[in-house]
């Protein structure tokens, strides 16, 4: 069943390709730091026309190369409450859209927090995000990319991971590495993101999956990323819907306010409706947030 699912996933990705060249690569060249040997198996589920991946054991980075690259790249973290990955409409579809702009897209299949497969599940996803940034920066010359134009993007819980990478780059999740390559992203794109673990606005599923049922006050503060923004945080672009019943819009608002307070360049687009998980297309409006993002990316170059 697993091999059949893998074949179906590869077919799905191949059918999504236009002029792009797609390459899936292991995130780590050898052993995965902090990993445990486990009987857990990766699951690929096709549901309601979408693709979901859970129980990720071996993280990968899939590079979508445009026909003519402009040097900018974005690492994309799909959402799914830190319990699964919406790899299609919050991953592959986004990389395809970036390719139309000449931007190289990287879809990150990151490990989801699980005590069975990692020594510290609170830092496992961040370790993968930091390794992805490190990898792209190290290979930038070979791939024709600008090492100073590497962004990170995330949806929902993937937005929490992206905002963690944007605020915790001085905290190496893999404390065994001797690599000094910078893991600071050059910009962050946060789409209906989980930002805060303040109980009043937290997405409880993401909070529990990442930190367990009884996190300490220090853990909650550490991973409430509106509290971790500094003047050195990268520019941020945020999108959210006011009627989001899953991740309250206050998550984006607090991050935006933290950016303004710390004089970090930020732009936020709030739509009155759209709910949660709309991906590229908020059907309640004719305005396309990806067009707004395109303008912003052109402005920060």
Residue ranges and their predicted role:
Residues 1-23, 301:
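Bacterial Sec-dependent N-terminal signal peptides
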Residues 21-68:
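N-terminal cap/lid segment of alpha/beta-hydrolase-fold proteins
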Residues 42, 46-48, 193-228, 234:
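Mobile cap/lid helix-loop segments that gate and shape the active-site cleft of serine hydrolases
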Residues 71-79:
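Short beta-strand element of the alpha/beta-hydrolase
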Residues 86-87, 91-94, 110-147, 281-288:
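Catalytic nucleophile-loop/oxyanion-hole region of alpha/beta-hydrolase
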Residues 131-202, 220:
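Primarily recognizes the serine-hydrolase "nucleophile elbow" in alpha/beta-hydrolase
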Residues 238-240, 244:
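Short beta-strand/loop motif that positions the catalytic acidic residue
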Residues 249, 253-301:
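C-terminal catalytic histidine-bearing segment of alpha/beta-hydrolase fold enzymes
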